[in-house]
Amino acid sequence: MPIGVPKVPFRSPGEEDAVWVDIYNRLHRERLLFLGQGVDSEISNQLVGLMVYLSMEDNTRDLYLFINSPGGWVIPGIAIYDAMQIVPPDVHTICMGLAASMGSFILVGGEFTKRLAFPHARVMIHQPASSFYEAQAGEFILEAEELLKLREILTRVYVQRTGKPLWVVSEDMERDVFMSATEAQAHGIVDLVAVENSADFV
């Protein structure tokens, strides 16, 4: 039987009594954000809205984005990435579990020196795929042209943010490339790998 979203007590400043709020609302108040599903327009809009709101509330405190995502749609993923670059606070990205496809693209978009992977996390990069497998010829050509443009955008970002040469990134994106946390660090996708029982990083 599903239990729904857990609720935790929260006391607003100046209030005597705590109220019960869902755990994600409580964590958002601490500037902790979560991408724990496939990337689509709904989660993209939620995360962008939260980043903008929290930036307006206090543009000096860092944001923390925890990622455990199999990837998803390219354009909503790019929207999250762009918002991370535009909001004034630094955005830490933390990979837990899996950051695949657009999940890894968002992971690499964290502030330099503030991208982290848990020790047993996995990262996967590849090129964007088409959704028009049964399209008419004309539609397929237009889709192919758009895919090439999107691939160029993603490749350019990976090159810029990993420091790897264009030919290395292009070759890696030809197929599904899975990496361990330490391999992702060597590849420049994350800067740090968390160690067990380390000091509190939040």
UniProtKB/Swiss-Prot annotation:
One of its GO terms (biological process) is protein quality control for misfolded or incompletely synthesized proteins. The active site is at S101 (nucleophile), H126. It is an enzyme of class 3 (hydrolase). The keyword 4Fe-4S does not apply. Pfam families: CLP_protease (PF00574). Coiled coil: none annotated. HAMAP family: ClpP. This is ATP-dependent Clp protease proteolytic subunit. The gene is clpP.
